[in-house]
Amino acid sequence: MAVGSIASGAVPLVIQDLIAGFGNVLTPFNLFLFFIGITLGMMSGAIPGLNGTMTVVLMAPITYAMAPDSGIMMLAVIYAAAVYAGSISAILFKVPGAPEAIMTTLDGYPMNQNGQLREAISTAVFASAFGGIVGTLILIFFSPVLAEFAIQLSDPEFFAVILLGLALVSTIGAGNITKATMMMCFGLFLGVFGVDPLTGVPRFTFDSNYLASGIDFITVILGVFAFSEVLKQIQSGGNLIGGGGGEGGGSDFSDATSGSMFSPFSYLKRFGRILGVNSVMGTIIGVLPGAGATTGALFGYTFGQRLVPKSVREKFGTGVPEGVAAPETANNAAASGAFVPLLTLGIPGSATTAVILAAFILHGIRPGSSLIEQQGPLVYTIFAALLMANVAILLLNKPVVRLFLQVRHIPRELLLSLIVIFTVVGAFATRNIMADLWTMFLFGVAAYYLEKYNYSVAPMVIGLVLGPLAEPSLRRSLTKAGGDWMVFFQRPVSAVMITLAVLTFFIPLIMDSTQFGDRIREQFGLTELEQ
């Protein structure tokens, strides 16, 4: 098969190679592996405590007995399906099935409680598929261009992007920037426990072997979202699954579109701006090595708030479909974008693509600038499989919605018991350390009381996830610059990002609390958007 060069703009050859990739995926054995990947990915994403990275790690050695295109294709499909499926448990139980779905809990679970379960899941399905498809198309046609962009970036830029993400955390704190910032800083502090990533020196371990390995963010996620919600449900005596989510339940929009694969225009009309902007933005975030789909979801949620009228923006966090569509579009696009540095530079864009890189090496293949030319059939098989996986997610909209709607028929006591079981098993299975169970219980109880006093736990978890990504880039940048902080302002991209981070943090305070903000909105015609 002739392999076209995307960089040369040979679009017809790219399409020809992509068609050949589809043909390869549709062979009986590869098609079987494709459906295995979809099933494993959705299960690992939807079950609390499991995640796509863990499943890819477990399946990677098995691929050694397969042809490279078959095995690596299956791993890519598992990743794509798991990123989407993480939203299912986030919506049903307020338990993110993957770190990428943390932001989805903010509106997905309240929609469930408001009787809009069908609408929430259906919105997540469509937004995930749309973001994944657009991200994969950008990957196919523009990966060399994006790789050139990524290779120009270094530690100052990576730190600046994550700093901007941390600044955006202040917008998700239930309207209280001070409390959100406090929780985010606490999460950053939790991220420094363990061994120093650059020097190997123990920090805040208190001579404890357990703390030397750091605080696992999966354990914290299970505690603050799952176990705390169980405590809340026991105390309130309410229903974990909101009423009205069944047939005939939900809003008019739900009745018109949820559970149907024949109404994409309804979604495009309502979420068009969010889908378009967040697909591109999520892909670009995914291209940055180390940023990953979790960062993409954070950017997507906050961008989504700025792409809707003020009347909708003020309801973010209380259960609006836009709050589900925004992060789901971005995180699935970012998952596709993470393949750009992997395939073109040999640099993983996320934890899961790092495992997929290991699978490449296991098969004697080293990703890099010449991979598309030397391993064209393999690369285009992966491209085709990613497209098919996201289309499959869209086509599975109706059966997936109907399947998960059945959860509301499970007795409340049994459902809470199952969540506790999955939470305990998930906390232990992550690292096989019994002390993680006590950590999970501790954070669960703490989150229960924090939320009673209106402290949002999401900023804390985001701080814990992003902190360990930001610290090495910050310290390497300062080491190379001899401790000169101006290194972040001498590079255009990092200077712009840090400036945006400062503005992102302070402008909402000015715009929302002063007459000056009202005059600015009137001067630039922003009052129309806010109606």
Write out the residue ranges for each language-model feature.
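Helix-loop-helix hairpins and the membrane-proximal interhelical loops
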Residues: 2-69, 144, 148-151, 204-320, ...
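Transmembrane alpha-helix interface/packing and boundary motifs in multi-pass membrane proteins
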Residues: 38-52, 82-94, 169-174, 279-291, ...
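Short helix-coil transition sites and intra-membrane helix breaks within transmembrane domains
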Residues: 44-54, 91-102, 134-138, 285-294, ...
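Re-entrant/interfacial helical elements at transmembrane boundaries that shape
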Residues: 52-62, 75, 90-110, 140-141, ...
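Flexible loop linkers connecting adjacent transmembrane helices
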Residues: 58, 92-120, 145, 154, ...
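Membrane-interface alpha-helices at helix entry/exit sites of multi-pass transporters
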Residues: 69-73, 110-127, 310-323, 351-354, ...
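A structural-propensity feature for long, helix-poor, extended segments
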Residues: 79-91, 97-98, 319-345, 349, ...
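Membrane-embedded alpha-helical modules
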Residues: 122-238, 362-512
